Amino acid sequence: MDKKSNQVERPVVFFDISIGDVPVGRMKMELFSDIVPRTAENFRQLCTGEYKRNGVPQGYKNCLFHRVIKDFMVQGGDFIKGDGTGAMCIYGGDRFADENFIEKHTGAGLLSMANSGPNSNGCQFFITCDACDFLDGKHVVFGRLVDGLLTLRKIENVATGPNNRPKLPVKITECGQM
């Protein structure tokens, strides 16, 4: 994987995160545009706000992480409904097909698409907090954390209530491309 990374310029995007009203750090993520170009581009444009509907930028700015499960993953990206039921993508409609399952859920800090079954990718994503190979072949891994593991751990350790929803808002206050 590192060899490919040196041969192809992969985009790097970022999230600035706050918990409650307190800024807790930045996460920088490298997108696997050479392995899953459609999935990576969907995420990239939702980070930058380039994609617009009716002239309004769509994306992750001010979006919440709505599901946090310690030692498993943190999930966000539902800027449509905020509760894990919303979907949207840059390709027209709400969802797009699974691109491939080449990359695996081998450890912490991997970006993967949240879905509701095969070929149901939209805007929701999760970041792994540990290896979770039981997700291989079901969720498309499309990037990795290159900086900000401590910020991920801060999100992972937020107190949660029903449906693993954080008791304090965990918000993407700013996002974009490096």
Curated annotation (Swiss-Prot):
Gene transcribed to yield this protein: cyp7
BP-aspect Gene Ontology terms: protein folding
Record-level Gene Ontology MF annotations: cyclosporin A binding; peptidyl-prolyl cis-trans isomerase activity
Name of protein: Peptidyl-prolyl cis-trans isomerase H
Organism lineage string: Eukaryota, Fungi, Fungi incertae sedis, Mucoromycota, Mucoromycotina
Residue span, PPIase cyclophilin-type domain: 14-177
Localisation per UniProt entry: Nucleus
Function: PPIases accelerate the folding of proteins. It catalyzes the cis-trans isomerization of proline imidic peptide bonds in oligopeptides.
Family: Belongs to the cyclophilin-type PPIase family. PPIase H subfamily.
